[in-house]
């Protein structure tokens, strides 16, 4: 009877389609965060160019940084991203067009040196986030005590109190319509989980969040620099996962899940740079980024196998909604010594707990109100520190180094909340820790152009949970990856 109960409720989980919701705090922080990306020079110096400026990619962080230009510039960048392993049939390496932009300078022909010196206009495309990530994890801490089915049982029992059954995939069918489940029935239409000996999990994510910025900047007296950028964004995020659990009753069930999000959005970025001492190259910068306002579309589905036999599939309908990222604030410092050395430092802050979901018409439904409350409870402010330096032993050759620290957006003991009326059959989540990025690079200048190379290594560890149980110990995982990139540029 246990096997038949498992079969029927699992079928309910994946075969009943609905156009309900799939968003939560884990997806929210995923869409709001950024990689270190841009030109190879920008990456090699850790992105710490907010006060130094002079790079096409800086319009995405401090729009005033393009005001440092005195000649026009065009650049295009390519990279290879390497995660070291594949999953779900996807490779662990991808080639990518990461950046392409142009900056046009207009000399105001003001020989006095006072007042407006240059007005610069530019446009730049780059990848804000590359979602390439692969995971393969053996879960060996269940010990005949824990199971995903206990979490499902809790959802079932909650839903029974509301005269619904089916949980996770759909709650629109009456519990009296079907009398079965993957769980042991308690005799009063309630459910209890079945302990598991072990489990296996595999996941692959891919796609990108790309941005295109249009920038305008001003150089006033070679001492004050102002800039603004308008950014448009395009999200294409894909997730595929596989979960297999072997119960103490000898039965094995498999879920293969897929989830896709597409969306577009826009923001405005404002920046200012000042050289407070006219005779000194020291400068500081200030930036404000508005939230990015997105319109998103989600779709997801699942396949079910029981003891290696195909059972059923289910695809949930598309659902449109709106999503708003946090405000972001930044300060930066920069200094140069002659034409041979430059150093920059930058700090950014965004409060992840202020992210917000809503219906397409802006209405804050009960579901989204609950998700927004969960975001406030489980996420926190995120701090980013960037430092970078450049050394030129000769005019044509540059050596660069950089470092980033990005704090975790998760509060201690954060967990994924799955509504009994949501479409998820994915119960897994990872509380990712701090990010450390290390960068190196070199550049070669020649008449009319340049070639830059950069290497980036990103290290991050996390606590992985296949499902939520207060007593379940996490499995340690990592998201380490490396990137090699090249930029080809032209000055005119």
Where would I find each of the regions flagged by the language model?
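Bacterial Sec-dependent N-terminal signal peptides
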Residues: 1-26, 488
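Predominantly transmembrane beta-strands of Gram-negative outer membrane beta-barrel pores used
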Residues: 44-47, 60-66, 73-79, 98-106, ...
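Strand-loop-strand
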Residues: 81, 90-91, 435-437
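Transmembrane beta-strand segments of Gram-negative outer membrane beta-barrel proteins
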Residues: 24-49, 67-84
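Asp/Glu-centered strand-loop micro-motifs enriched in Gly/Pro and often flanked by an aromatic residue
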Residues: 43-57, 87-89, 199-205
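Short secondary-structure boundary/capping segments within folded domains
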Residues: 34, 49-51, 57-58, 63-71, ...
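Outer-membrane beta-barrel porins/channels
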Residues: 23-37, 42-43, 105-492
